[in-house]
Amino acid sequence: KYIAELDVIGMDFENGRLDIRHAYQKMSMCIRKFVHEMTDIKVQNYTLRDIGTLGIPDVYSLVAEYYAPEFARRSEGDVRNSLARTRSAIERWI
């Protein structure tokens, strides 16, 4: 279901229904929900620092990648690459 959620984010971005900032926000929520389901750790409201203490480097790396596009005054990022990295991280876990 999380891979399908990423596919929808990708399609919505490609079709102009999501801008960069919102695409990254949705990716962040997707990976956080996935981690919660897999570990029972409620990471939905964790800061990047909190996530760093979990010992899950893939998740830390992804959320760190999302931070600038999510919160910067001007969002920049490679949504397609980030979607692929997120998809790959989820596939390695399942």
Outline where the language-model segments fall.
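Charged alpha-helical initiation segments
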Residues: K1-E14
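Membrane-proximal, non-transmembrane interaction modules
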Residues: M11-I94
